[in-house]
Curated annotation (Swiss-Prot):
Catalyzes the hydrolytic deamination of adenosine to produce inosine. Unlike mammalian adenosine deaminases, also catalyzes the deamination of 5'-methylthioadenosine (MTA), a by-product of polyamine biosynthesis, to produce 5'-methylthioinosine (MTI). Plays an essential role in the purine salvage pathway which allows the parasite to use host cell purines for the synthesis of nucleic acids. One of its GO terms (biological process) is hypoxanthine salvage. The gene is ADA. Inhibited by coformycin and methylthiocoformycin (MT-coformycin). SUPFAM superfamilies: Metallo-dependent hydrolases. GO terms for cellular component: cytosol; external side of plasma membrane. It is an enzyme of class 3 (hydrolase). Zn(2+) binds at H42, H44, H226, D310. The record marks D172 as: Important for substrate specificity for S-methyl-5'-thioadenosine. This is Adenosine deaminase. Pathway: Purine metabolism; purine nucleoside salvage. Its EC number is 3.5.4.4, 3.5.4.31. Its cofactor is Zn(2+).
Length: 363
């Protein structure tokens, strides 16, 4: 991991009006996307890796000796898309094969932070599920957490704090060790390290877990849960429960808010931000195409949205790919992107001193 990188010349607001993206090649645009000071709120640390990193883990542990590199990537990852969120979750569970020991988990955290820095992210909220990382090899969640915190801290310090990183804890469903109550207890035990609490995995109506989420929220940990992502669900109950029962401050994905004017009005009134993950939504078939992705409708309706990469290891993408897609297919401008990042900064769960520093430096 080569820490020595050219510093990024981040865009200033007064520069934007002089940049004509329409006259640029794709390669030139990517240089601009990198220069946007990005605040990313929704990325799963346990699914944030490059193809090279993932393949090195597979080969190190001799996991698929009879498969070529291309076959390994097809077997585990979702870069070519699929049929549904359910299919994605099943593949993500396969990826837990690489969580073989604490060394690889620490290395994963280091690479994730460094790659986000190279992409031009200045404020990064990673989230991870202790039980998901632990379940395949029965690892100790305390030692997992120590490895992740150590890896993040080491790289942030090597980068002279040019990227600010925080963690959210996920209580999930969909694998044998999933236990939302245990994850909530773990989150509160390590509240010095976690800035928020989430639910991930299969999208379910979380009102059945109201007491657990109340317990976390009333203990001072804000909530952002996955809801309004899975278009195969027959109704919008997950969104209503997240907003009215759990009293979340943000929603992971939330794109199905676009299906209800009542929900649009509700998230605006309650100042709830939607952590939108455009490429993820298309690859999981929760949006039919990027041209028809609901983020355009939501943004135009005045809903606060931000741009996120979700599971870049599964998709073999990075956050700048999402910006390119939104520009190319939905005509979002640099001004729009700067506004979305200001919203993300405003709604970040990080300490106000860090947020003020980022705001003064970049916005």
């Amino acid at each position: 991991m080569n820490i020595l990188q050219e510093p990024i010349d981040f865009l200033k607001k007064d520069e934007i009006k002089n940049i004509d993206l329409s006259q640029m090649s794709k390669k030139e645009r990517y240089k601009i996307w990198k220069r946007i000071p990005k605040c990313e709120l929704h990325c799963h640390l346990d699914l944030c890796f490059s193809a090279d990193f993932f393949l090195s883990c597979i080969r190190k542990y001799n996991l698929q000796p009879n498969l070529s590199d291309e076959e390994v990537l097809d077997y585990y990852l979702f870069a070519k898309g699929g049929k549904s969120l359910g299919e994605f979750v099943e593949k993500a569970i396969r990826v837990a094969d690489i969580f073989h020991d604490y060394e690889v988990i620490e290395d994963l955290a280091k690479h994730a932070v460094f790659n986000k820095y190279k992409e031009g992210v200045v404020l990064m909220e990673f989230r991870y599920s202790p039980t998901f990382v632990a379940f395949k090899y029965k690892l100790d969640i305390e030692l997992i957490h120590q490895a992740i915190v150590k890896g993040i801290k080491e790289v942030v310090e090597l980068l002279d704090h040019k990227i600010h990183v925080a963690l959210m804890c996920i209580g999930d469903t969909g694998h044998e060790a999933a236990n939302i109550k245990a994850s909530a207890d773990f989150c509160l035990k390590h509240r010095a390290d976690f800035v928020g609490f989430d639910h991930g995995g299969h999208e379910v109506d979380l009102k059945q877990y109201k007491e657990i989420f109340d317990y976390v929220r009333e203990s001072g940990i804000p909530l952002s849960v996955h809801a309004g992502e899975d278009v195969t669900l027959p109704n919008l109950n997950t969104l209503y429960s997240a907003i009215q029962v759990l009293k979340v401050e943000r929603i992971g994905h939330g794109i199905r808010v676009s299906e209800s004017q009542e929900l649009i009005d509700m998230v605006k009134e309650k100042n709830i931000l939607l952590e939108v993950c455009p490429i993820s939504n298309v690859l999981l078939k929760n949006a039919k195409s990027m041209d028809t992705h609901p983020i355009r409708q939501l943004y135009d309706a005045g809903v606060k949205v931000s741009v996120n990469s979700d599971d870049p290891g599964m998709f073999l993408t990075n956050i700048n790919d999402d910006y390119e897609e939104l520009y190319t297919h939905l005509n979002f401008t640099l001004e729009d992107f700067m506004k979305m990042n200001e919203w993300a900064l405003e709604k970040s769960f990080m300490d106000s001193n860090i947020k003020d520093k980022v705001k003064n430096l970049y916005f």
